[in-house]
Swiss-Prot record:
This protein's name: Pseudokinase OPG198
SUPFAM superfamilies according to UniProt: Protein kinase-like (PK-like)
Lineage of source species: Viruses, Varidnaviria, Bamfordvirae, Nucleocytoviricota, Pokkesviricetes
Assembly mode: Interacts with B1/VPK1. Interacts with host VRK1. Interacts with host VRK2.
Keyword Transferase listed: no
Regulation: Both catalytically active kinases B1/VPK1 and host VRK2 repress B12 inhibitory activity in a B1/VPK1 deletion mutant strain.
Keywords linked to the UniProt accession: ATP-binding, Early protein, Host nucleus, Nucleotide-binding
């Protein structure tokens, strides 16, 4: 794809391709619209057609992250916005497929406590919406939470999972999947090979929150075996967990309560999002 200077999406929009932002399983390019300024304000994610995660992500954007559905959902609840990107284009070549979203800024790195509290509320709102549509995100980690102009965006929907089987019954807990993702933020269920459920998304968000509030994850730089062992042990001894995350004893009580509530959720249980959200709403 490096040899291409531009390409057209399925609606005929022309996208001029700039520098590579990231190269891994998929490739991210800076892109801009034709006949606009010289600034590359968009990002194109591209991969080979045989790569199923990108296809799944495109389908998720189309079928679940519908702007009208999001608008209705937020208006009914009096929510300003959800941390969900808008989709600006989808396309394919003979061998590749791609989609285009706005350049959503940098990884969220809060500078004050107020911004952390706001981020916690926004992310709980966003996960509640995704869960209400019958899916989990499955890959909550800091690098997937971006900020631009004080607005958060949750990206990377390549590992979403359906919550329900036919007949609207919750998926069963089975440890039969190959795990993938950043082991530092992975939920215990995913470590063990189970599909990420609602509690898993919220658990992963909790690990992000710990770092946002200035704590450290005690299993950083450990092997995957040691990481899962520590996480399972810490779930039994939450006080010890926070002593190790915040050695100076400055852990926020709101965060401690959040982790306590999330750790007690059953695999198929519907979380009390309002209770979790209220922990971080400041008067």
């Amino acid at each position: 794809m490096e040899s291409f200077k531009y390409c057209f999406d399925n609606d005929g929009k022309k996208w001029i391709i700039g520098n590579t932002l990231y190269s891994g399983n998929s490739i991210l390019y800076k892109v801009r619209k034709n006949f606009t300024s010289s600034f590359y304000n968009y990002v194109m994610k591209i991969d080979h057609k045989s790569h199923k995660p990108l296809l799944s992500e495109i389908r998720f954007y189309i079928s679940v992250l519908d702007p009208l559905t999001i608008d209705n959902w937020t208006r009914e609840r009096g929510i300003k916005y959800l941390a969900i990107p808008d989709l600006y284009g989808i396309g394919e070549t003979d061998d590749y497929m791609f989609f285009v979203i706005k350049n959503l800024g940098r990884v969220f790195a809060p500078k004050d406590t107020e911004s952390v509290f706001e981020a916690c509320v926004t992310m709980i709102n966003t996960l509640e919406f995704i869960h209400s549509q019958g899916f989990t995100h499955g890959k909550i980690e800091p690098r997937n939470i971006l900020i631009r102009n004080k607005r958060l965006s949750l990206i990377d929907y390549s590992r979403t999972n359906k919550l329900y089987k036919s007949g609207n019954s919750h998926i069963d807990y089975n440890e039969d999947m190959i795990t993938s993702g950043n082991i530092n933020y992975m939920c215990v269920d995913n470590h063990l090979g189970a599909t990420v459920s609602r509690r898993g998304d919220l658990e992963m968000l909790g690990y992000c929150m710990i770092e946002w509030f200035g704590g450290k994850l005690p299993w950083k730089n450990e092997s995957s075996i040691k990481v899962i062992k520590q996480k399972k042990e810490y779930k039994k001894f939450i006080a010890t967990f926070f002593e190790d995350c915040f050695p100076e004893g400055n852990e926020p009580l709101e965060l401690v309560r959040y982790i306590e509530l999330v750790y007690t959720l059953d695999y198929s249980q519907t979380p009390n999002y309002d209770r979790l959200r209220k922990l971080f709403i400041q008067d």
